[in-house]
């Protein structure tokens, strides 16, 4: 018998679910009861078992009897109302979430092992994070292992501490929780006085009970950042401050130290969004390097120097670099012997150390790497013998790799970015042909969809996603005129998800359209995107250029020494100011001015 063609009906699953839902509403074909708080809900065992691994396990270990009795599934810790909402979700894929019910739904989804529902709850919680609730959401997320939500809530707390410290939630913290919060290195306060004043407000909220915790809580204060004249002024005006300073011996009232002694004890709060470069090759010898450096364009605008960080465990070139959840991840690439690698490493900016990661399923170089909610997606590339279309995903919390659907085509040296929790693959080439096509991958449906193509076909470009926008910078193509094979730098392009089309950016001040320019990375920080590469301006080479999204204009960064490296991997990474300060001291990047008497 001849083989036929496989055909499918896209509405088949939806129709089936609607029919099953109507059976449930009419209590038809039900063969079990859920028992919650003494109330029974008729259900179909096979549907619940398919949806919930927890119920499936209960059925496997306690199978129905053949005596004709109604099978009962007892559940504790879930209310009838919430369970009905979850049953509606199981049969429709939709659920109503609000701030009053979200905690109960997460608890139920956690018990029933409904991972898809838990993911929807996480996305809802992400949109709820605010000054009034970020500490509570942070604690809740930690308890239920909602890792990405916990990271976002912590990041919000660090960034908006002054707003958070004025809320009722902050004033109701336990002494232990308060101490944990004010111990965070990255609190964005500018001056330690704001942390001190937050603690004063907390004590004053219930003075008689909290006085006994005064000394313990104040031990978490970074007293080196408190000005003695400010403290003396507060003591004159506030009896509570007088009592606290008298009780806590660690709070300084003497004149601050000067010179080297001051630097040795100084510990600045806050963080800096840094441009990090990793690996690549030495410009002169062309040997792969393990070097890692960072530059903080907003930390010290007048001193934009490169700070040396801990090097990789091995030299890498043509590797993938990405920051996620406060860490930096590096995978694949090639070593000094041009051997294609599958290994990976993770950088912890708090410890300034690297640790090894489980290797990728396939060794590859010149591949794409993007991140969505703590999941790292590795796309395409080459393995030294052939071009790859495979995709795999690394969960940074479970430390496991899973295979994903293949790319629909080879995109040699294409560019990739994430935007609105979807992955975009752009440009690239294969067998001498360059592409302008763009495809979008939705991890939920695991489907690739073609979208509006780029205005210019290109390879070797870099891309990034910011909010609802995609940016593609640089890349090269052959000149489309009688001059034939000469390569030129492509114009940068911009895509907005609402308008669904690509628009040229003004690249006049990025680089000249010659083949001598190469881009290595595009790093979004604040309201700007920093493009890193060998950027030929016509008169000299720049290593970093700033693109201001609000005005669509390019700007020089402060004067930088010419880089001795090329083809580096690039990313943005949030690093604590106190760590950067120590590194700058160790590397002699600070100089003390001693005023003559």
From Swiss-Prot:
It comes from the Eukaryota. It holds the Pfam family Kelch_KLHDC2_KLHL20_DRC7. SMART domains: BACK, BTB, Kelch. GO terms for cellular component: Cul3-RING ubiquitin ligase complex; cytoplasm; cytoskeleton; cytosol. Kelch repeats lie at residues 274-326, 327-374, 376-421, 422-468, 470-522, 528-574. GO terms for molecular function: ubiquitin-like ligase-substrate adaptor activity. Pathway: Protein modification; protein ubiquitination. Keywords: Cytoplasm, Cytoskeleton, Disease variant, Kelch repeat, Neurodegeneration, Neuropathy, Repeat, Ubl conjugation, Ubl conjugation pathway. InterPro entries: BACK, BTB-kelch_protein, BTB/POZ_dom, Kelch-typ_b-propeller, Kelch_1, KLHL16_BACK, KLHL16_BTB_POZ, SKP1/BTB/POZ_sf. Residues 30-99 form the BTB domain. One of its GO terms (biological process) is protein ubiquitination. Probable cytoskeletal component that directly or indirectly plays an important role in neurofilament architecture. May act as a substrate-specific adapter of an E3 ubiquitin-protein ligase complex which mediates the ubiquitination and subsequent proteasomal degradation of target proteins. Controls degradation of TBCB. Controls degradation of MAP1B and MAP1S, and is critical for neuronal maintenance and survival. It is linked to Giant axonal neuropathy 1, autosomal recessive: A severe autosomal recessive sensorimotor neuropathy affecting both the peripheral nerves and the central nervous system. Axonal loss and the presence of giant axonal swellings filled with neurofilaments on nerve biopsies are the hallmarks of this neurodegenerative disorder. Interacts with TBCB. Interacts with CUL3. Part of a complex that contains CUL3, RBX1 and GAN. Interacts (via BTB domain) with UBA1. Interacts (via Kelch domains) with MAP1B (via C-terminus) and MAP1S (via C-terminus). This is Gigaxonin. It comes from Homo sapiens. The gene is GAN.
